[in-house]
Amino acid sequence: MAASPIKPAARIFNFGAGPATMPVEVLEKAKWELVNWHEAGMSVMEMSHRGREFVAIAAQAEADLRKLASIPAGYKVLFLQGGATLQFSAVPMNLLRGHDVIDFVNTGEWSKKAIAEAKKFAQVNVAASSEDRNFTYVPRQSTWKRSRDAAYLHICSNETIGGVEFHWTPDTGDTPLVADMSSHILSRPVDVA
């Protein structure tokens, strides 16, 4: 493998939300495998999604995720494009199932975006909000004013813009809990069952 084009003293470390610093060794391996994945003679980006090599990559990714997140066998793992923003519309389109109301806990900018998108599909009940103190806390669950028949309760479990994070999993009883965990997924154990 060739020497890294970045000298260690010149390397910039990003500790911001979102993209993060990666070890140079990982980047170097990715660089080489991008061009020729495991000596297959082509890049992963050039492979057929039905081809043997790519099917093996997808199966290994699912197995790894199941192991890391302790996902039970009875659950499906979906690898979807679009990120959290697309899910703001995909979730209500798929989970309303005849319900008219969605409950939200509004803890910041990402919650507000999810609420705005959900309003296109259903009535939105903001069960709790920390807007009164500029989104600097998570409201205690005992203060939430939930709907009786909500399709689900939505939280953004880590508001990266304001720096507010749920350090607990809300008990929603029989109401499904939807958590936007896109900024901290796999950062701690989560009971997905």
Q: Whereabouts are the PLM-identified features?
A:
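Basic/polar N-terminal segments that are highly enriched at the extreme N-terminus
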Residues: M1-R11
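A glycine-/small-polar-enriched, mobile loop at the entrance of the PLP active site in fold-type I
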Residues: R11-E62
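Short active-site oxyanion
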Residues: Y75-V77, D100-D103, D174-P176
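PLP-dependent aminotransferase-like
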Residues: T85-L153
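Active-site phosphate-binding strand-loop segment of PLP-dependent enzymes
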Residues: G18, A118, S129-I185
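Gly/Ser/Thr-rich loops at beta-strand to alpha-helix junctions
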Residues: P19-M22, A84-Q87, G108-S111, T160, ...
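Conserved active-site segment immediately N-terminal to the catalytic lysine
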Residues: V178, V192-A193
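Conserved N-terminal alpha-helix of the aminotransferase class I/II PLP-enzyme fold
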Residues: G41-Q87, N94, G108-E109, E117
